[in-house]
């Protein structure tokens, strides 16, 4: 279809889904993850990738949205999801056998127009059918990348039409023999890097301790790519075990940064109240 941008096509504001972290919503520049787009969240193991996605799912459900979770890693924990505020009984969960099946399910969900957000956890676990049916040790060079490339070509148009947010979680691998620059790369070839409107790099920067006991992680998220606002901003927040993103701690940090809350030593005060 061809159209003229003369105002007859109403320019609407970009719809977003909150990440559950105020600082990250601000860093994204539009107040959350953009709908009708592909988002990639990647980082090392235990950095909070799935937690961040489940926080966003909880926010989407709070606004009356319908969410689907494609669990290719077969590691979804409903008890933990419920603690983060996810209405597990309203969540569509799929645990596919092959990468092709997972992406086919994703495409069907998107085309139906009945879901607002789809999470694929994770790209690394989308194993091509030929690899599953083959023997251990067989070489399947480029198969995973080809699968992703083909699926994203199909998906991207449907995602825009139905205004669905699709989030791909990805893992990090090391490139061998890299002398200069970062040796880190994400799995599944280059297609996802191109098709993503937002790419988030999530890292664990430290531990939160209560006495000797570790009760959470300090987390930093960098916006590596952003097609809907200026990129390269970052957010820092705490993820507490069994609770998710520490909303109160983040609110205080942002308040201090913007001189709304005064900090003196270990005390915080707002309008004279400590």
Swiss-Prot record:
Which GO molecular function, any one, fits this protein according to its record? single-stranded DNA binding
On whether ATP-binding is a keyword of this UniProt record, the answer is: yes
Q: Which InterPro entries match?
A: AAA+_ATPase, DNA_recomb/repair_RecA, DNA_recomb/repair_RecA_CS, P-loop_NTPase, RecA-like_C, RecA-like_N, RecA_ATP-bd, RecA_C_sf
Recorded superkingdom: Bacteria
Q: Which cysteines are joined by disulfide bonds?
A: none
User: Any keyword Transmembrane?
Assistant: no
Residues reported in the UniProt entry to bind ATP: 43-50
Can you say where in the cell this protein is located? Cytoplasm
Keywords, comma-separated and alphabetical: ATP-binding, Cytoplasm, DNA damage, DNA recombination, DNA repair, DNA-binding, Nucleotide-binding, SOS response
Q: Which GO terms describe its biological process?
A: DNA recombination; DNA repair; SOS response
One Pfam family this chain carries?
A: RecA
Q: Which GO terms describe its cellular component?
A: cytosol
Q: Extract the NCBIfam families matched here.
A: tigrfam_recA
HAMAP family registered for this protein in UniProt = RecA
Q: Which family does it belong to?
A: Belongs to the RecA family.
Tell me the function of this protein.
Answer: Can catalyze the hydrolysis of ATP in the presence of single-stranded DNA, the ATP-dependent uptake of single-stranded DNA by duplex DNA, and the ATP-dependent hybridization of homologous single-stranded DNAs. It interacts with LexA causing its activation and leading to its autocatalytic cleavage.
What PANTHER family would the database entry show? MITOCHONDRIAL DNA REPAIR PROTEIN RECA HOMOLOG-RELATED (PTHR45900:SF1), RECA (PTHR45900)
Protein's UniProt name: Protein RecA
């Amino acid at each position: 279809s061809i159209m003229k941008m003369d105002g007859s096509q109403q320019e609407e504001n970009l719809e977003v889904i909150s990440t559950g972290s105020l600082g990250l919503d601000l860093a994204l520049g539009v107040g959350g993850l953009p709908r009708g787009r592909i988002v990639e969240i990647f980082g090392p193991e235990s950095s909070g990738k799935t937690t961040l996605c489940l926080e966003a799912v909880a926010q989407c459900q709070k606004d009356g949205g319908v969410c689907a979770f494609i669990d290719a890693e077969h590691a979804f924990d409903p008890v933990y999801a419920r603690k983060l505020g996810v209405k597990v009984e309203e969540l569509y969960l799929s645990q596919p056998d092959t990468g092709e099946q997972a992406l086919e399910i994703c495409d069907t969900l998107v085309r139906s127009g009945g879901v607002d957000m789809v999470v694929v956890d994770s790209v690394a676990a989308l194993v091509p059918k030929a690899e599953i049916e083959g023997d251990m040790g067989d070489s399947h060079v480029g198969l995973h990348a080809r699968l992703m490339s083909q699926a994203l070509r199909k998906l991207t148009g449907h995602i825009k039409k139905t205004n669905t947010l699709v989030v791909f979680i990805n893992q990090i691998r090391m490139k061998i023999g890299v002398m200069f620059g970062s040796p880190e790369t994400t799995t599944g070839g280059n297609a996802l890097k191109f098709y993503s409107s937002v790419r988030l790099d999530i890292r664990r920067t430290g531990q939160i301790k209560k006495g000797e006991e570790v009760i959470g992680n300090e987390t930093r998220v960098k916006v590596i790519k952003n097609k809907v606002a200026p990129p390269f901003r970052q957010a820092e927040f705490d993820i507490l075990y069994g609770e998710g993103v520490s909303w109160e701690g983040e609110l205080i940090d942002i308040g201090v940064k913007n001189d709304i809350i005064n900090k003196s030593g270990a005390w915080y005060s707002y309008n004279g109240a400590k």
